[in-house]
Amino acid sequence: MYGLDTADLEIQRRARDFADELIPCETTAEEHDGRLPDDLAQRHHERALELGLYATNMPTSVGGPGLTALQQVLVQEQGGRVTNGLAWCLATPPSWWPEVANDHQRERWLLPTVRGELQECYAITEEGAGSDLTDLAATALRDGDDYVLNGVKWHVTSFHEADFAFFQAVLTTGPYAGNQALFVVDVDTPGVRVVRTPAYTHTLGHRHPVVAFEGVRVPSTHLVGTEEDGMSFVFEWFRFERLMVAARCLGAAERLVAETTAYAADRVVGGEPLIRKQLVQAMLADSLTELYAARAMTYETARSIDAGVDRKVLHARCSMAKLFASEMAGRVADRCLQVFGGRGYMRENVAERFFRELRVERIWEGASEVQRLIIADQLAKRGHAELV
């Protein structure tokens, strides 16, 4: 089904089996503020590496598995079946880095990250710059062979677990003043500090602190690419991660439909199984239909990446996939919680966890409203035929 070949089915099987290993740990995480014991989390990390499910977007030239975009979607889809962020051990470093990393970056950060020895985080978003990054206030001042970085970043996901951060800032001097540039910063560099760590709704094991960079000095070898390239890396990351968001939403919706259907078949109300009630049937039928449509869209978008379709067309298609799949998963979670009734409001219930965790998929990596603007912009410029 879906035209998957033997290699696709094998990577999908491995990912599904691994997700099935993670799912029993959800209750443990839920009972401990979202976190697993360190030794168990480490075993999951090592298992992902062992199975070839780590850094799946990395080419073989840097030690990655060299999977196709479709195969990467298949892996992340299975990870999406797991709550509490436990499948974040299926980490993917930035897809654009191997092409632009200088020798220093390659040896110090890139290769160890692909091997699973280091972890990155992203210091991009600010209080006044979320989906629209053109309003960044963070600055980068060239000072001899160094850059001095200043800025306060919000939602720096997994900062507490990270070894280094990608820091986006506006250049203040030189021929490219006003451009945005991207830098690699070790999290223990003097001047980097956590301002506060707010409590969030989802994936409690991964904190999302506000982090200040105050007079942080880094050598020019920490500049990613050139002073002209900063926004291009962000756009490339958005294309990739929006598709992966869509993939994870497929997995979440599939598990919700499966577990809710099983519950409705067993639950007897008024002398017959709940699944015989037409209103429940309608909710499950709508959910399954929307999942089927979202999966077809997401897989086809991945195939268009593998086929080398124009990047701006891909930008719109990835936005369409994220928009449709994330909103689909939110509707499915809402319906499934309703079918479970009071049980669906208990933390031990899968519908409660997904209802809470899936909400962010319509916000991060560009809110749904931004996706609609991107799609509409490309429609106006290219017409519908090139996009669909």
How would you describe each model-predicted region?
Residues 64-67, 131, 222-227:
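Cytochrome P450 core scaffold surrounding the K-helix E-X-X-R motif
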Residues 92-101:
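Helix-loop "lid/cap" segments that line or gate small-molecule binding pockets
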Residues 145-146, 150-195:
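A short core secondary-structure module
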Residues 135, 188-219:
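Flexible, small-/acidic-enriched active-site or ligand-binding loops
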Residues 212-236:
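A short, charged helix-loop
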Residues 116-124, 168:
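A short, Trp-centered hydrophobic/proline-enriched beta-strand micro-motif
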